[in-house]
Amino acid sequence: MSKSTFLFVYIILILGSMVNEIQGQHAMCHEILPETDCGAGSCTALCLQLWRGTGKCVRTNDQKLICLCNFECIV
């Protein structure tokens, strides 16, 4: 009885790990929203609406403000 229980648990663990591989890995993705104005929280609101992420205005090397959206994605 204990061998069959051990085998059953082992099979369940193997199947669970296979399902996790099929579903993909979660990672942090980044997207630049070039058409977004960086005033009055529009960057944060648009990023939240599009990808349920967090948006932040950052300054580029040429001193332009761009909206950078960070969100969780599956790769």
Curated annotation (Swiss-Prot):
Tell where it localizes: Secreted
What's any one GO cellular component for it? extracellular region
Task: Name the domain of life this protein comes from.
Answer: Eukaryota
Alphabetized UniProt keyword annotations? Antimicrobial, Disulfide bond, Fungicide, Plant defense, Secreted, Signal
**Cysteines engaged in disulfide bonds, as pairs:** 29-73, 38-57, 43-67, 47-69
Its principal location?
secreted
Its Gene Ontology biological processes? defense response to fungus; killing of cells of another organism
Signal peptide positions (record)? 1-24
For this chain, the family text in UniProt reads:
Belongs to the DEFL family.
Protein name per its UniProtKB record: Putative defensin-like protein 126
Its source organism is Arabidopsis thaliana
